């Protein structure tokens, strides 16, 4: 089964005839081709890739199962013609991606065609369940990320800045084969480590915790990992904070299984952190799905519905943290999957014992 046939099956099940896909990542997800100007028009039995002259040759070499169309004039007019040829009067669009301006533009061109939401829901549900090849690509992305962590431990010196560390991680990941970054790299030290999404500064590294949250993008798929180390020596409270986060993470990881209610994983980690006296200092959810998008479903969160359960093909992060405002913070993050045989696979191999440099 391909991502295209999965989508077409879901279209049929939804009672829909045709969908228009315009967002870059979803286009790549469905056809495997990375380009920035075009559309996919997918019906239950046909699929078109519409793009301009710049991408035609590459598309023909890379894409199968799609009819590749180069517009003779305006791209939207070409799509309108295809809609008319296929007797389409109702068109599913990506409700989560389409701006109001784009919606108005499409409505103005596609006269007599009703634009309805629904494509985003189908894609979200499909992306949540990875196929075997997707898990293999994510594993490769994480291997690049693990290698970057091993490298950075030998790079860090007191003369480095947070920005030095972030840029070195990024350079190394690209050197190892990453096509891009999964997200903006976080490398924050000392008091700045209390900011869960702190921005690296040009200041020299501060003593204390150094939190590094980074990931590679490989063949379109993301990895996501956080490690916190100590620059200098950890005092007793820092050791308590670190070990509490590590204990919470390991407990949640050990409990993960096929069929687990997602919010229960969050509760396991949160209860341990709360018991240690830091409940108010763990302000985000335990984890999120990862795929072509760095944040996907499912969510390991206290607010997740009871109906949200872990199933085969899910990839999630497990990333508890403790943040003491104006003092420091600590987060440890692994990325795991419920594998296709129902077992739990931890993609992340980097050490988690307290490291002092």
Residue map of PLM features:
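Active-site neighborhoods and metal-handling regions in enzymes and metal-associated proteins
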Residues: 1-357
